[in-house]
Amino acid sequence: MTTNEKVCEIIIKVKKGKLTLDQLKPEADLYSDLDLDSLDLSEILVLAEETFNISVDIGKEQQVKTLAEMVASIDEYRTA
């Protein structure tokens, strides 16, 4: 399973099924398109840390705007 697929699963889990895979396009804005808020983002990051065995910089991740940026950022942590 790719990083993108795992991140999409995490987002769907956090949004409790209110989003579908069809909505999770790489260019999707996390806030306006996917309707995430800061609490959702925090939960996603905690689950990403557990799933990928990484430690993320919350401040850096708050600057991420799209799904593609989030996936790229997580990949950076995984290879660091």
List the predicted regions and their residue ranges.
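Phosphopantetheine-dependent thiolation modules in NRPS/PKS and related acyl-activating systems
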Residues: 1-36, 44-46, 51-80
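Two-component histidine kinase catalytic core, primarily the HATPase_c
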Residues: 40
